[in-house]
């Protein structure tokens, strides 16, 4: 059941105080009803209420449907493709799969353990306990990804971990082609959305780093032709949200990766030549 207007306001207050996710905040508000009691429970380390047992059972059955026959502790690539087909997700063009990966605790591309899979779906509002209900919730995740800066960064950074091979991988960077594919998946949809996950700081005004600047970034990276480090990947979002249209407000003494320093100089040279 959707939250009432009053409860939605309480969730916003709870998140502002505790820094938790919307789903986690909603669980505390639904259980404790009042902001003071919910915050006290959070800081006293009382767990958020678990999903309804019937919901957990049904979600477990969904996971079982897609688990790998040769490795019954995981859903793997084949099962993920079947899941995507049932949810009408094109994994090559729809970033919502990365939303699910981040929310459902996927540690490697196309792999899902049962417990975080069940807990992740149960954390969504609306008592989702079937594939049709999960499919109906995907537009909400797509909208959240392009409009919520906190959520965008969470999903975007999780995508880096998946693409480099998961937390156990010794690979510390992404091949450039992979990074470009992912940047193209994440950034352009957020540019024209209002509110935007890439809104300009500090006033959350419309983005000033938009498609033309993004195209220059891709052009620059293709000329450099180097793998993309974790720092460059993560800080590109902060850079995009802070830079002005004319690239005049860049803090050259800030702790930016050298790749971003070089990009700023590249753009300034382009602008001087116009």
Swiss-Prot record:
<dbReference type="InterPro" id="IPR042460">
    <property type="entry name" value="DCN1-like_PONY"/>
</dbReference>
<dbReference type="GO" id="GO:0032182">
    <property type="term" value="F:ubiquitin-like protein binding"/>
</dbReference>
<comment type="function">
    <text>May contribute to neddylation of cullin components of SCF-type E3 ubiquitin ligase complexes. Neddylation of cullins play an essential role in the regulation of SCF-type complexes activity.</text>
</comment>
<protein>
    <recommendedName>
        <fullName>Defective in cullin neddylation protein 1</fullName>
    </recommendedName>
</protein>
<feature type="domain" description="DCUN1">
    <location>
        <begin position="54"/>
        <end position="268"/>
    </location>
</feature>
<dbReference type="Pfam" id="PF03556">
    <property type="entry name" value="Cullin_binding"/>
</dbReference>
<dbReference type="InterPro" id="IPR014764">
    <property type="entry name" value="DCN-prot"/>
</dbReference>
<feature type="domain" description="UBA-like">
    <location>
        <begin position="7"/>
        <end position="43"/>
    </location>
</feature>
<dbReference type="Pfam" id="PF14555">
    <property type="entry name" value="UBA_4"/>
</dbReference>
<dbReference type="GO" id="GO:0045116">
    <property type="term" value="P:protein neddylation"/>
</dbReference>
<dbReference type="GO" id="GO:0097602">
    <property type="term" value="F:cullin family protein binding"/>
</dbReference>
<dbReference type="GO" id="GO:0000151">
    <property type="term" value="C:ubiquitin ligase complex"/>
</dbReference>
<keyword id="KW-0833">Ubl conjugation pathway</keyword>
<dbReference type="InterPro" id="IPR005176">
    <property type="entry name" value="PONY_dom"/>
</dbReference>
<dbReference type="GO" id="GO:0031624">
    <property type="term" value="F:ubiquitin conjugating enzyme binding"/>
</dbReference>
